[in-house]
Design a protein with these regions (language model features):
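Short, well-ordered strand-loop elements centered on a beta-strand within folded domains, enriched
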Residues: 31-37, 77-79, 141-142
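N-terminal active-site beta-alpha-beta segment that forms phosphate/nucleotide-binding
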Residues: 1-61
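Surface-exposed, charge/polar-rich loops and edge strands
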Residues: 60-65, 74-77, 88-163
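Charged helix-capping and loop-helix junction motifs
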Residues: 14, 81-86
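A structured binding-face within diverse protein domains that lines the active/interaction site
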Residues: 52, 67-70
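Short glycine-rich anion-binding loops that position phosphate/pyrophosphate groups of nucleotides
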Residues: 2-5, 70-74
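Residue-level signal for inorganic ion chemistry
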Residues: 23, 66, 82, 124
Length: 163
C-alpha cells in the first residue's frame, strides 16, 4: 500500500479486483511483512500505512508483484524508504516473479546506489513513462517521454524500434 510520496495504487487495485484478480497486500509485523488477502475496511497501522486486518493465509503462487517506489537506479533496483521489507519478502518467494515498479514521477539515477539484495524490477511505470528491463540488463523506455535524471547529468537514449 502506498506510503508517503509513493504513488496511489488504490485505483489499480480496484480495477484488478473488478477483473476478479486475487489481490494481496502487505501486513506489517515489526521489521517484516507478510502478504494477506485484501479485505475492507482498511485501517491505518502505526506507520500510517493502510492495511487489511491480519489473517492466516498461505500464499502459494505469486505471478506478479506491484511495488510502489520513489525511483530506480542504473541496475533497475528499487529506491524506497530503506527498511528492506520488500527485499525480505521477495527473497522468501520460491520462484522469480515479474516485478512491476510504480511511481508518481519517473525518477532515475544513472548511478548504482542500491545493494545487490535490493529488489530488482522488470517494469517501471509512471504517469509519463514506461520502462522495461531487457534480459541483458539494459533499459528500454517509451520514446514519447523522458526520465527525470536525479543525481547526475547523463542522458538516456531511447530507440522506438526496441519498444
Amino acid at each position: 500500500m502506498p506510503f508517503g510520496n509513493e504513488v496511489n495504487i488504490f485505483p489499480l487495485i480496484s480495477t484488478l479486483r473488478k477483473k476478479k484478480y486475487s489481490v494481496f497486500v502487505p501486513y506489517i509485523q515489526e521489521f517484516y511483512f507478510k502478504m494477506i488477502p485484501l479485505r475492507m475496511p482498511l485501517q491505518k497501522n502505526v506507520f500510517g500505512i493502510y492495511e487489511s486486518n491480519n489473517s492466516t493465509f498461505n500464499l502459494i503462487k505469486v505471478d506478479a508483484v506491484i511495488i510502489p517506489v520513489l525511483g530506480i537506479d542504473k541496475d533497475f533496483r528499487r529506491i524506497g524508504f530503506g527498511k528492506g521489507m520488500y527485499d525480505r519478502f521477495m527473497s522468501c518467494l520460491k520462484k522469480k516473479v515479474y516485478v512491476i515498479f510504480v511511481a508518481r514521477s519517473p525518477n532515475y539515477t544513472p548511478s548504482v546506489i542500491t545493494e545487490s539484495y535490493d529488489v530488482q524490477g522488470d517494469c517501471f511505470v509512471t504517469p509519463s513513462a514506461l520502462c522495461l528491463r531487457k534480459h541483458n540488463g539494459s533499459m528500454v523506455c517509451n520514446r514519447r517521454y523522458n526520465l527525470r535524471i536525479i543525481g547526475g547529468r547523463e542522458c538516456i537514449s531511447y530507440h522506438k524500434k526496441d519498444f
